[in-house]
A protein has these predicted regions:
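Sec-type signal peptide cleavage vicinity
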Residues: 1-296
Length: 296
């Protein structure tokens, strides 16, 4: 092709809530890209679908609208996962904008990436690394039975008191942020309702066994301050021999000690809920949740 170098794709796996490289490949990616030459900016990739081509001689990331590097141009790349995320690219701001994103139980992971390349001073046609980061935070609630009886049922699970709808935007320079839409979830919202399926026969008394409160595991939440707010986890449970369900409202912003004061983008928080005979205690820790890498 007259010495032109194609912009191609490859993948390298890192860990994420999307569990494994296959998760990223199944979701596919949406790419926006521009180049600027002699003061003129041109849209190079406009919501281009990146897919993992397993039929290629060597399986790789691929796309249909082949593009080539242009000497002396400067490039901006922005990408988002999943592909069907309803986002647009603002030429005026040079940012990808995802409006009215609603975080709920079971919503898909949301990842974003950006990169820049300036060929004006250096004719570098090598791989551009896109580091996909998590736009949301993740929380995992686990049950531990330290009581004197088997836990036989958990019901009416819900998380409320925080924002769950917002607009997310990010640019090729790596800047990113959220703007909340509307008020916080109230007690009656089912956005973060959930179910807890216990093992056959119930959850036994065992300090070494942690059972996920939500059947789906970790849930996504918008990054926000929780310290001294009304963010609350509600659940009701019954142990073997109990006449009634125990009703618990755990105020996550008032746990004290060294517990996190905010949920940060790209961080995952594990809340271990230990059920004793008459109460429930909570321990919180930040656990590993790192990112996916895609080579451009």
């Amino acid at each position: 092709m007259g010495g032109l170098t194609e912009i191609s794709f490859a993948s390298q796996y890192g860990r994420a809530l999307i569990e494994g490289a296959e998760g990223l490949r199944k979701q596919e990616l949406k790419l926006f890209g521009t180049y600027t030459l002699d003061g003129n900016t041109v849209r190079l990739f406009d919501a281009e679908r990146l897919y993992y081509n397993t039929s290629a001689e060597k399986p790789c990331w691929d796309y249909d609208n082949t593009q080539y590097w242009i000497s002396k141009a400067s490039y901006n790349f922005c990408a988002i996962c999943p592909y069907d995320a309803p986002c647009t690219f603002s030429d005026a701001e040079g940012r990808v904008i995802l409006g009215n994103y609603e975080a709920t139980t079971g919503c898909p992971d949301l990842l974003y990436a950006s990169a820049q390349r300036d060929l004006a001073e250096n004719e570098d046609f090598s791989t551009v690394y896109l580091n996909f980061r998590h736009a949301c935070a993740a929380v995992q609630f686990n049950l531990v039975n330290a009581s004197n009886a088997t836990l036989i049922d958990v019901r009416n699970i819900r998380l409320f008191g925080m924002h769950n709808v917002g607009t997310f935007s990010f640019g090729a320079d790596g800047s990113a942020g959220w703007v909340f839409i509307g008020s916080v979830l109230n007690d009656y919202s089912q956005a973060y309702g959930g179910a807890c399926t216990l093992p056959n026969g119930g959850l036994p008394v065992n300090l070494n066994v942690r059972h996920s409160l939500y059947d789906g595991g970790a849930i996504l939440v918008l990054p926000q301050t929780i310290y001294k707010t009304g963010v609350t986890l509600h659940l009701e449970y019954k142990k073997q021999g109990d006449a009634e369900y125990a009703i618990r409202n755990i105020e996550l912003g008032w746990l004290g000690g060294s517990t996190p004061t905010e949920w940060k983008s790209g961080e995952k928080y594990e809340y271990n809920l230990t059920i004793t005979d008459n109460t429930i205690t909570t321990e919180v820790k930040v656990v590993d949740w790192v990112d996916h890498y895609v080579e451009l």
